[in-house]
Amino acid sequence: MKLETQYHGIIEYNENNIINLVKGMSGFENLKKFILVGIENNEVFSLFHSMEDKETAFIVSSPFYVKADYEVNLSEELVKELKIDSEKDVLIINTVNLSKDIKKMTTNLGAPIIININKHLGKQIIISDDEKMIKYPMIHS
């Protein structure tokens, strides 16, 4: 299948690529279907693109690229909501704020997107509103 996007051209995907958010992203609550697509020649960043709005996409990354000891405690409620059976089912990604100055790029460690990769369910959760976590530097000088 193909998804025509505003800024990234045509993205090919299959049903298994679709992530259904049980609640939309913060500020985009009405958008619930996304695909996670790798960016060619880039192991750090991926594209989290809405299936419902061809203009909405987020650059995302694993939090472990910038903070090896990053931890998220999942509530029992979230584990049930996302039908998580094992830690191996879980993928954690965070949105990235790009900048022309690479030293100013940040990631939002305060609001991770938790994905059950086997059930294709996800949810963005708020774990911190601390400015240091919301705008965590991608590169430390």
Curated annotation (Swiss-Prot):
Pfam families: FliW (PF02623)
Annotated Gene Ontology cellular component terms: cytoplasm
Gene encoding the protein: fliW
Biological process per Gene Ontology, one example term: bacterial-type flagellum assembly
Function (record text): Acts as an anti-CsrA protein, binds CsrA and prevents it from repressing translation of its target genes, one of which is flagellin. Binds to flagellin and participates in the assembly of the flagellum.
SUPFAM superfamilies associated with the record: BH3618-like (SSF141457)
Protein name as it appears in the record: Flagellar assembly factor FliW
S-S bonds: none
Classification via Gene3D superfamilies: BH3618-like
Keyword Chloroplast attributed: no
